[in-house]
């Protein structure tokens, strides 16, 4: 059995397929997706279709067990669907137009109920194998246990405060994404696996990263769309 985490996909369906092929996962394996499945990239609907297939394969025992965490972009999409105040404008300026374009059909935006339901059941945080998985990070002023006992969804989805902070209060290593890095960040109590697959046009970025745990072995594939 292997435990993997996969970083921010951001609509890069072909890149995700290449990474999954590279990992050669079995039904005995476990995979935690760090969130941000949609926005900015060319094929957000196809990414969600792929994740739904992985979920179905896991339920049938034909694929690895999967945990799909929620990212801030996934939350923005849900807020838009729910008609939350200012949700469209916030989503629009954060890459949501690429996602909406993928759902255009006959001049209308048609988002499948299965995609909405999938995002609605994504948790914000997950513990497994001696690691805590979360999209953005945790509050560095509190221990990991305190963060989990008093969860702050906005911190889990949006924070970057931990990246330059003293993490001495964190008693458990945290695996996150959200903030793109040219290389995976690998510290004793922090792993960041967002290597900016969707930012392939920027120097140093443009790979999708997985990490195998607890070995901390990184697997990266270049952007393919």
Residue ranges and their predicted role:
Residues 1, 76-77, 97, 104:
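Detector for methionine-enriched segments
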């Amino acid at each position: 059995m292997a435990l993997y985490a996969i970083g921010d996909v951001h609509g890069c369906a072909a890149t995700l397929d290449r990474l999954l092929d590279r990992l050669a996962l079995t039904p005995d394996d476990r995979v935690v997706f760090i969130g941000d499945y949609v926005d900015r990239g060319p094929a957000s609907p196809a990414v969600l279709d792929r994740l739904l297939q992985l979920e179905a394969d896991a339920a049938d025992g034909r694929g690895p067990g999967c945990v799909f965490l929620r990212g801030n972009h996934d939350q923005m999409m849900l807020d838009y669907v729910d008609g939350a105040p200012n949700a469209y404008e916030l989503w629009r300026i954060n890459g949501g137009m690429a996602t909406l374009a993928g759902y255009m059909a006959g001049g209308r935006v048609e988002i499948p109920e299965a995609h909405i339901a999938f995002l609605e059941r994504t948790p914000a945080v997950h513990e497994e194998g001696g690691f805590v998985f979360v999209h953005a990070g945790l509050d560095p002023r509190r221990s990991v246990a305190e963060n989990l006992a008093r969860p702050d969804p906005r911190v889990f989805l949006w924070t970057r405060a931990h990246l330059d902070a003293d993490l001495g209060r964190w008693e458990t290593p945290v695996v996150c994404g959200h903030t793109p890095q040219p290389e995976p960040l690998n510290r004793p109590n922090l792993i960041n696996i967002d290597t900016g697959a969707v930012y392939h046009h920027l120097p140093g970025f443009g790979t999708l990263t997985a990490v195998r745990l607890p070995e901390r072995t990184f697997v990266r594939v270049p952007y393919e769309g």
